[in-house]
Amino acid sequence: MTATAQQLEYLKNSIKSIQDYPKPGILFRDVTSLLEDPKAYALSIDLLVERYKNAGINKVVGTEARGFLFGAPVALGLGVGFVPVRKPGKLPRETISETYDLEYGTDQLEIHVDAIKPGDKVLVVDDLLATGGTIEATVKLIRRLGGEVADAAFIINLFDLGGEQRLEKQGITSYSLVPFPGH
């Protein structure tokens, strides 16, 4: 099933836009409204599974927290394992971490050291691509463990915030179902 214009429009229309959230001047794209629509949620998963079913993926990595909501079902659909990347202190086994820059400060992500094996072909999944900082840190974690990032997939791409270009500089191609302006 290749995504049709009608299907993609349905997905786009299922995502609510909230003005001035979380602060004045921001137009927030709320993917949780897509989750409330079982047809839209299933369609988003089905389209990603269809795109990657013959790509040789053997692990899907999802970033905290909404990346779990899309990454885990995509992993099930592909018949492969799912690996969560989390904020510090949330994973019980030995981890490695990566610090990345935010607009005001820094943040950190962690992954279990035994979750990715050398040579694993990994699909990174998250709900939204904005500036690309979270995904760039996730890619660094995967590569430090010897994994190969095959692609990064998103439901939403805020195309004017530079995330796609940032990932390209790291050698990562990306795919998104629904483009929106970020401003």
Swiss-Prot record:
Listed A to Z, the keywords are: Cytoplasm, Glycosyltransferase, Purine salvage, Transferase
* Main localization (coarse): cytoplasm
Q: Which InterPro entries match?
A: Ade_phspho_trans, PRibTrfase_dom, PRTase-like, UPRTase/APRTase
Task: Report the pathway entry.
Answer: Purine metabolism; AMP biosynthesis via salvage pathway; AMP from adenine: step 1/1
Q: What is its EC number?
A: 2.4.2.7
Q: Which reaction does it catalyse?
A: AMP + diphosphate = 5-phospho-alpha-D-ribose 1-diphosphate + adenine
List GO molecular-function terms, semicolon-separated: adenine binding; adenine phosphoribosyltransferase activity; AMP binding
Which CDD domains does the UniProt entry name for this protein?
PRTases_typeI (cd06223)
| Annotated localization | Cytoplasm
Gene Ontology terms: biological process: adenine salvage; AMP salvage; purine ribonucleoside salvage
For whether the record's keyword set contains DNA-binding, the answer is no
Q: Per the record, GO CC terms?
A: cytoplasm
Mention any Pfam family matching this sequence: Pribosyltran
| UniProt-listed PROSITE patterns | PUR_PYR_PR_TRANSFER
Q: What does this protein do?
A: Catalyzes a salvage reaction resulting in the formation of AMP, that is energically less costly than de novo synthesis.
Complex formation: Homodimer.
Describe the family membership recorded for this protein in Swiss-Prot or TrEMBL.
Belongs to the purine/pyrimidine phosphoribosyltransferase family.
> Matching HAMAP family, A to Z?
Aden_phosphoribosyltr
Protein name per its UniProtKB record? Adenine phosphoribosyltransferase
UniProt source species: Escherichia coli O157:H7
Q: What is the name of the gene encoding this protein?
A: apt
